[in-house]
């Protein structure tokens, strides 16, 4: 078979460690634009360095990642149940009774430079019970378009992500111009923070694979990638912000508590201590619950 757009390939020079999807082949230079199949990585490579992955090898790599994804989901659900038990105890004053209470988690605006990743993320938000509005746009359009979306959606949390990469030939790790899309993420965060300055009023996650972590945090992001300029998984932003959305506003979330259930951990992700967003209320009548569709315990 011939390598073409949408082919799933790997790079021989990197021991075929990551699956990529072919975006475009430049016929004149024989350079191929690539995006990670599961990682938020943007790259290019000579056509001669690429190999079509056999179905068996693709499934092997996908299954390895799926085990990590399933583990992260299990750990997150365990944490969520513990948080839920704590909230129920606090809401009822430690007494057992038949009253039902409702929960209002933080609302997410998830802006993604990759439409396929966006769909995967939206499915995970739904499984975790986090309200979300998802928007697909190119990373370059984000600085201009995202601030306008805030007025329409009025989110508690903003996710700014897509693809990125550190390009050694363009400069050192401290040089923002040596990154494919970090400058767009940084500009977006700065624009948003001119509207909403307080870190607990709007929680921001920004970045993708190998992004310029320090610049994103300095611009005003609560959480960002990538401290060690490593790759992050497509679903990592979801786990980070969902932890904030489902933690009581009475509690502060420590960075390690957020990172331990992600697929990338502290090498790929970091941030600052942030207040939770979830609020509980009671009572709620069963017929009203059905009518208003309030999320209940």
Residue ranges and their predicted role:
Residues 38-94:
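Intrinsically disordered, low-complexity, charged/polar segments
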Residues 186-232:
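Catalytic cores of nucleophile-dependent amide-cleaving enzymes
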Residues 2-4:
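Short, well-ordered loop/turn sites that connect or cap secondary structure elements
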Residues 16-26:
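Short beta-strand-centered aromatic/proline hotspots
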Residues 150-163, 221:
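Proline-aspartate-enriched helix->loop->beta-strand connector
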Residues 204-219, 277-297:
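Charge-patterned, long linear interaction tracts outside catalytic cores
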Residues 22, 30-40, 45:
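SH3/SH3-like beta-barrel fold
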Residues 137-140, 227-236:
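Short, acidic/turn-prone active-site loops that include or flank metal/cofactor-
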